[in-house]
Curated annotation (Swiss-Prot):
Keywords: Metal-binding, Ribonucleoprotein, Ribosomal protein, RNA-binding, rRNA-binding, Zinc. It comes from Syntrophomonas wolfei subsp. wolfei (strain DSM 2245B / Goettingen). One of its GO terms (cellular component) is ribonucleoprotein complex. InterPro entries: Ribosomal_bL28/bL31-like_sf, Ribosomal_bL31, Ribosomal_bL31_A, Ribosomal_bL31_sf. The keyword Ribonucleoprotein applies. Binds the 23S rRNA. This is Large ribosomal subunit protein bL31. The keyword RNA-binding applies.
Length: 67
């Protein structure tokens, strides 16, 4: 392996939009995610209650007449 070409590896803090924080290994020091295992419907068991902040689901339903 060549010396001094690899990025530095950090224990990074990942912050979710819901406020949850957890540590992961990454080349970045801070990571921001929109959804994590604390707020994702698959892990919480809340089917059909996904928070849609941009209105994409509503626009899709309106466009295809699914609402």
């Amino acid at each position: 392996m060549k010396a001094k070409i690899h990025p530095k590896y950090h224990q990074a803090k990942a912050r979710c939009a819901c406020g949850n924080e957890f540590e992961v290994g990454s080349t970045s020091e801070n990571i921001r995610v929109e959804i994590c295992s604390k707020c994702h419907p698959f892990y919480t068991g809340a089917k059909g209650r996904l928070v849609d902040t941009t209105g994409r689901v509503d626009r899709f339903k309106k466009k295809y007449g699914l609402s």
